[in-house]
Curated annotation (Swiss-Prot):
It is an enzyme of class 6 (ligase). Binds 1 zinc ion per subunit. The gene is alaS. It comes from Malacoplasma penetrans (strain HF-2). Catalyzes the attachment of alanine to tRNA(Ala) in a two-step reaction: alanine is first activated by ATP to form Ala-AMP and then transferred to the acceptor end of tRNA(Ala). Also edits incorrectly charged Ser-tRNA(Ala) and Gly-tRNA(Ala) via its editing domain. Its EC number is 6.1.1.7. InterPro entries: aa-tRNA-synth_II/BPL/LPL, Ala-tRNA-lgiase_IIc, Ala-tRNA-ligase_IIc_anticod-bd, Ala-tRNA-synth_IIc_core, Ala-tRNA-synth_IIc_N, Ala-tRNA_ligase, Ala_tRNA_ligase_euk/bac, DHHA1_dom. SMART domains: tRNA_SAD (SM00863). This is Alanine--tRNA ligase.
Amino acid sequence: MSKKLTTNEIRKLWLDFFKSKNHTEVESKSLIPKNDDSLLWINSGVATLKTFFSGKENPPSKRLTNSQRCLRTNDIENVGLTSRHHTFFEMLGNFSIGDYFRKEAIEFGAELVFKVFKLDPKKIYITVYEEDQESFDLWVKNGAIKSHILKCDKSRNFWEIGSGPCGPCTEIYYDRGEKYDFQKLGEKLFFEDIENDRYIEIWNIVFSEFNNDGKNNYTKLARQNIDTGAGLERLACILQDVPTNYDTDAFVNVRSVIEKYSNKKYDNNLYFESKKDSEKVFINKCFSVIIDHFKAVIFAISDGALPSNKDRGYILRKLLRRSFLYLNYLKVSFENSKEIINTIISNNETYYPYLKENLNNVINTIKLEYDLYCESINNSFKKLNELLNKKLLDASDLFNLVTTYGFPIEIVQSLQELLTQSKDAKNLKLAEDIINSINPSDKKISISKLKIEFDEFEKLFDEHRLIANANASVKGMENQNEELLNLPTLDSSFDYEIESVKNSKVLKIFDENWKPVEEIKNKDCWVILDKTCFFATTGGQEHDTGKINKFDVVDVIKSPQGYHLHKVVKGTFKIGEKVDGQINSFDRNIIRKQHSSEHLMHSALKRVVSPTIKQEGAFKSIEKITLDFSFNRKLTYKEILGVEKEVKRIIATKNPTQVLMKTLDEAKEMGAIGYFEQVYKKISGKLRVLYLCPESIEICGGTHVYNTGDIEDFMVTGLTSKGSGSWRIEAVSSNYLVDKFKNNVIKKAIDDFNNYFKKYKELNIKDDEVEKYKKTDINSIHYLELKEINEILKNKINTLVIRKEKENLSKESNEIKNKFTEVKESTKLFLLKDIDRKLLFNSLVLAINEAKSTVFLVINEVDGVIQYVLCSNESFAKNNNLDFNLYAKDLNAKLGGKGGGRSYLVQGTILKIDEKELNKILDTINAKLK
């Protein structure tokens, strides 16, 4: 498009287009969900329409369209670092509730993309669900290039998010060109689903056929529905042709306001620099985070949310405190930040007029939070300076500062990133500038005083992260809830060896807002018992579930003092009453096997692969085992098989296990491995040491098998890179989980392998790379190797299919071309039926380059649509002063058509075939040629 569309114009074009297709516009709803406990925030365009799709409410129309404001915070750390991550964004959508389905949805999609937004079909790529041939054919029919359409499996093209309608989907991608393809990989990026900034998904169209109850139980919908989503910010980025979403008009003018008050400037060219300056990267991140987070907070407060220590309030507090940190670094005062707020509201008030009405409330709320932030920073730096006056700061000091005194974790992460990259003078200075930008004291802090082992800090922080991620609603509570922090000493104990308790006394009750109560009736709550059999999430092991009396226990975490807090659904309790508890024995038994297997796998990695392997973290649940470790290369399949074999060998020994209580020195003397030594040193009593076998002795507080034979079976199921030198290995144990994996995942992999060769045989093409895998003994190789081979075969077969299609197309094109060129007249009319449009076009291109003095008028009727093409050789048209657009206008007027094109080739559609009128056109051309 000649003029770049603004974000507001793009939104209006979308809504106006669908209103022209008889859709009713639904206003953008509040970010705070109404009557939907499954969501903390509205996080998608369809989230506010779920009751319409389920049939619980009648929609205002069967066809709906909207631009829904959304908020997601699951990857907040990526904001400002990647091109497209946001906390706040708008999702454009069109919806059909029991009205149109695939055909119309794809027709609308093609028309909007190709004709309204005028995106070049050559730059559009499509994915469809592998079993959805109808969508594939519809895209081809509506102008998509066949070779640009990729069939994908369920993981990529089956849409579901939480509870509600779901089904197969088709996605539209846009190719932004080589300047966004730094490695020059081309289409490989799209076809192999490699993360990139070149091929960007802009629209997802979901064919809703099922309802997910939130527990992956699917039922057929009584009526077929369509729901779609297109990110407004992404569309703006593409239509405005800028490097990132943060370079679109909605961000640029806010950035200018920040620059007005800061001594730092945003670097517009940084994206394209191959070697990025660390200070520029940090400065750009500051700008983007401030704008993104402020926008999210402005909308959320205007919708009724307020900062606090829990749930939505905690999210707002975190977003604001991150913003304040980066404002400090850019030296922008709170007073000047008011203009940032005003500008964001001005950008959005046309479509969201309610923002202007809430301006004063927003500013006052943010000011209160800023005052609390300053108080927190003052307290944390006071403690930091006390520590620095006594000694150098180590990892445990820093951990305590963050978790107890509220020192910003973002500062720690920035220091870690800079100081582990390179300790050159520039990075050291930047690190000092960052920490001192929020330092309220005139006395500057020197980086030389911070002797921090960041790896050790990460280990200390692992458990904190695990609990926070396990229950996002209590993340803020664990750090800041005074009621829990100030719990009195309680006589409460956990017994590893029992699976039920009788007559346990209720010591404490908290309601769902973490307020202590004496009694609770039929409400979600947290309780502490004097004795419990429920294991609490700790050390990477998932908590037990079960029942207290008749009430479900769905989570168990530890209080800051170590008491087990049981989350109970709709419980009825009062302090002092006696209750019975029973864990889910099946799940506990599985987790025992999983945890013991993780120890054996770790030991086997060190012995089979290398003693230099260093564990970074682990997680054990009833579904899988994950173990993160550092190593300088990827494991070979032979090594993975060796690890499996070694773990199975120890299982087969049926070695009795032991739990020993030892001091730290005693544990180390017997060869026990431990990863939290700084924590263990603070424990005055004895430590729990698990002895599985001579090869595996670890300090551990988890639940384990009593005999290695109890594990039954073991299998490695995954190996992925987490970054340079960091790996994650996944596994399962027990007959139950291994058999489940074999019957579901491995069986499918074997079926896929066989199907690829079946397809290869059908193609009747010989390929050396495919032939190489033909004799693979899939029973003797590891599943992960089979998975890799399948990926190679999948890509290779797809390439061969495209090659075959091109060969067939070329052959058919030549056959039709020959029919065209047999004619020796200067003009000729051809009436055809059911010829593929692309095939016809290719044939005519060949024909006009062979029969260089002939004008062709071709009529082709396909599925009731009458297509015309009028063309000749380009030089012939030019030499004879022919402009076929003039004849196309005449043809359109007489036969109810529309179309046009270049001077030597025009195409379009007509409503009827009238040979007399068509020949008149050719007669006119003939007359001009004489």
